[in-house]
Curated annotation (Swiss-Prot):
<comment type="function">
    <text>Putative tyrosine recombinase. Not involved in the cutting and rejoining of the recombining DNA molecules on dif(SL) site.</text>
</comment>
<feature type="domain" description="Tyr recombinase">
    <location>
        <begin position="85"/>
        <end position="248"/>
    </location>
</feature>
<keyword id="KW-0238">DNA-binding</keyword>
<protein>
    <recommendedName>
        <fullName>Tyrosine recombinase XerD-like</fullName>
    </recommendedName>
</protein>
<keyword id="KW-0229">DNA integration</keyword>
<dbReference type="InterPro" id="IPR044068">
    <property type="entry name" value="CB"/>
</dbReference>
<feature type="active site">
    <location>
        <position position="213"/>
    </location>
</feature>
<dbReference type="GO" id="GO:0005737">
    <property type="term" value="C:cytoplasm"/>
</dbReference>
<dbReference type="InterPro" id="IPR013762">
    <property type="entry name" value="Integrase-like_cat_sf"/>
</dbReference>
<dbReference type="GO" id="GO:0006313">
    <property type="term" value="P:DNA transposition"/>
</dbReference>
<dbReference type="InterPro" id="IPR020876">
    <property type="entry name" value="Tyrosine_recombinase_XerD-like"/>
</dbReference>
<feature type="active site">
    <location>
        <position position="149"/>
    </location>
</feature>
<feature type="active site" description="O-(3'-phospho-DNA)-tyrosine intermediate">
    <location>
        <position position="245"/>
    </location>
</feature>
<keyword id="KW-0963">Cytoplasm</keyword>
<dbReference type="InterPro" id="IPR010998">
    <property type="entry name" value="Integrase_recombinase_N"/>
</dbReference>
<dbReference type="GO" id="GO:0009037">
    <property type="term" value="F:tyrosine-based site-specific recombinase activity"/>
</dbReference>
<dbReference type="InterPro" id="IPR011010">
    <property type="entry name" value="DNA_brk_join_enz"/>
</dbReference>
Length: 248
């Protein structure tokens, strides 16, 4: 389906800037949807842009719908599909946020600091302050473990194999902390800025550290973790704040 992006763009009278925007949006769309379009994949894409600003969502929906109509016109698609606001999983006080497709978070990027921050939150459910406090001495990549020491106590967290290369890359030359300059940890604003830049670069503008941590919670619950187990993993004093995720 990606091979039809350029012919589609060429069929429209667009400025250079608009062409770039269309190309960027459609490459992301094709990456998530793949070669076979169906309602489930469109819902996945819809959920992936749920946290964007209203204007960004409107632009991406419009671009994707134009492309879908084009594919139907040239008979690449046998059926006409259309993305609408009603397709997404609506979030209310009693409903849970949708699990997003995170494959794009692991792809090569120039924003390596923001990428690693986001992956540590997605993979381990860490808070920004916990990420900032990761010490080199407490990372054991051979045994794939992180010993996290905080005011709340000590937690030993397993590191997934997919996370190891990202950590290895950033450990080079570090003295005390994983995120530091000459042994001094970076500021809270530094972490905020780098995370914001990275998520924006992959089309998830508006996705905060809190929302990334929520993704970890949703995935762990889906994997069968009990509320007590998840509370221990996150280092919470009480599972009360997790109750909303376990309500039927």
């Amino acid at each position: 389906m990606k091979s039809y992006i350029e012919p589609f763009i060429a069929s429209k009278a667009l400025s250079q800037n608009s062409q770039k925007a269309y190309r960027y949006d459609l490459q992301q769309f094709c990456q998530l949807v793949g070669e076979r379009v169906n309602q489930d994949k469109l819902l996945l894409y819809q959920n992936s842009i749920a946290n964007l600003s209203l204007s960004a969502k409107k632009r991406k929906l419009s671009t994707a719908n134009q492309f879908l109509y084009y594919l139907y016109q040239i008979k690449y698609l046998n059926s006409y599909f259309r993305l609408t606001d009603t397709m997404k999983v609506m979030r209310t006080e009693k409903q849970q946020a949708a699990i997003i497709n995170t494959d794009i978070f692991y792809q090569k990027t120039p924003f390596v600091w923001g990428q690693l921050i986001s992956l540590l939150i997605l993979e381990l459910g860490l808070t920004p302050s916990e990420v900032a406090g990761i010490e080199v001495a407490n990372l054991d990549l051979n045994f794939q473990m992180l010993t996290l020491k905080t005011k709340k106590g000590v937690r030993v967290l397993p590191l997934s194999q997919i996370l190891i290369p990202f950590l290895e890359q950033q450990l080079v030359g570090k003295e005390v902390y994983l995120f530091e300059h000459r042994g001094i940890p970076f500021s809270r604003q530094w972490f905020f800025n780098h995370l914001k830049t990275f998520v924006r670069s992959i089309g998830y503008e508006g996705l905060t550290a809190q929302k990334l941590r929520e993704q970890f919670i949703l995935k762990e619950k889906l994997a069968g973790k009990s509320i007590i187990e998840l509370s221990d993993i996150l280092g919470l004093k009480s599972p009360v704040t997790l109750e909303k995720y376990y309500k039927s």
